[in-house]
Structure formats: structure tokens, C-alpha cells
Regions:
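The feature marks short-to-medium sequence segments in extracytoplasmic or secretory-pathway proteins
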Residues: 56-80
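Short acidic/polar inter-strand loop motif in beta-rich domains
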Residues: 113-123
Length: 125
């Protein structure tokens, strides 16, 4: 019985390695902060590609009321204009996102998201 279980676990791990290579990365966040003077988010983006010239933008979701803490909240998807760029080198870039298009009244909670699973939440006064 134990032998079959070990074979099954080995097959699952081999299939996982074949379908999801270790080199697959996604855009992620380094430092994230709110700049009160310019009313912008300052985000250090960590990403892989063939060049450092990626451009990032925000796609706002709908404002959600009734969040924990009593503040309205919104999800903002961070989009990479070169999301299909082959992942050859590591890069980082400091990006400033304007909050003019934020659909929630302030103060509010913003959750930044990148595909497939990275997120960062902060409160904007």
C-alpha cells in the first residue's frame, strides 16, 4: 500500500513540474506606499522579461461598501503591457499610479492585484 502511495505522489509531483515549470513567474509588488503630496500610489513592481520597458496601469473594480472596518474598498488590477514577454531577466521599476479614477469615497481600502495571485492592501486617507 505504501509503495502505491509513493508512486502516486511521485506521479503528481512530476505532472506538476511538467505543467508548471519553476521558471514561471508573475509580476509582484516590492514596496507600496501612498504619497499624500501628489495623491498617487508609489509601487515598486518586480517582474521578469527581456527588457525593462514594461508599462503598468490600473484597472479599477467597483467600489464595495460594508467592508470590515467600516471603510469602502476597491480592487485594482495592475496590468502589464508586456505580460507575454519571455521571462529572461529580473527587473524592478518604481511606478506612480494616480488615484483620480478611484471609484470609492475616502477614506477607503485599496487592494492591488496582479495575475495570478499576488495582492497588497492599503488604506488611503
Amino acid at each position: 500500500m505504501h509503495g502505491r502511495r509513493h508512486v502516486l505522489v511521485g506521479l503528481i509531483l512530476a505532472a506538476d513540474a511538467a505543467l508548471f515549470p519553476a521558471s514561471v513567474q508573475a509580476d509582484n509588488f516590492g514596496r507600496v506606499r501612498y504619497d499624500r503630496q501628489t495623491d498617487r500610489l508609489v509601487v515598486t513592481m518586480l517582474y521578469r522579461g527581456t527588457n525593462p520597458g514594461h508599462t503598468f496601469s490600473l484597472k479599477w473594480g467597483e467600489c464595495q461598501t460594508g467592508q470590515s472596518g467600516g471603510l469602502p474598498g476597491v480592487n485594482a488590477e495592475v496590468l502589464d503591457d508586456q505580460f507575454n514577454d519571455p521571462e529572461e531577466q529580473d527587473f524592478q521599476k518604481s511606478v506612480r499610479f494616480s488615484l483620480k479614477g478611484m471609484p470609492c469615497p475616502r477614506p477607503a481600502t485599496i487592494t492591488l492585484r496582479t495575475a495570478p495571485r499576488f495582492f497588497y492592501t492599503l488604506t488611503i486617507p
